[in-house]
Amino acid sequence: MRRRSSMDINRAIRVAVDTGNVVLGTKQAIKNIKHGEGQLVIIADNCAKDVREDIFYYTQLSETPVYTHQSTSIELGAICGKPFPVSALLVLEPGNSAILNVNNEE
């Protein structure tokens, strides 16, 4: 299986935002993860350390996979088509996207 390129992942994120059900923001992502919702968490590379630790803690409890995107929160926001930074997003439903097939390099 070939390794997914950055452009493929960016496109998959955008399609998930446009056609699926995605929660943007660390607070909302953590809230939904605590309730056992969500299929994949994507966090920006520059996400704050304490927030990153909280996300990893709750995703381990709920067995939700985490993907660290190799971009800043500003770039991740732009990929999502938003005019603001996005440090984390939670995919509730992928829509027409293949985002759930992403493999984390961590």
UniProtKB/Swiss-Prot annotation:
Keyword Ribosomal protein listed: yes
UniProt keyword annotation of Ribonucleoprotein present: yes
Recorded GO MF terms: RNA binding; structural constituent of ribosome
Give the InterPro entries listed for this entry: Ribosomal_eL30, Ribosomal_eL30-like, Ribosomal_eL30-like_sf, Ribosomal_eL30_CS, Ribosomal_eL8/eL30/eS12/Gad45
SUPFAM superfamilies the UniProt entry points to: L30e-like
An example GO biological process term is: translation
Per its UniProt record, what PROSITE patterns does this chain match?
RIBOSOMAL_L30E_1, RIBOSOMAL_L30E_2
Q: Print the keywords alphabetically.
A: Ribonucleoprotein, Ribosomal protein
Q: Name one GO cellular component term.
A: cytosolic large ribosomal subunit
An example of a Pfam family matching this protein is Ribosomal_L7Ae
Q: Which HAMAP family match?
A: Ribosomal_eL30
> What family is it from?
Belongs to the eukaryotic ribosomal protein eL30 family.
Name listed for the protein in its UniProt record: Large ribosomal subunit protein eL30
Biological source species: Methanococcus maripaludis (strain C6 / ATCC BAA-1332)
The coding gene here is: rpl30e
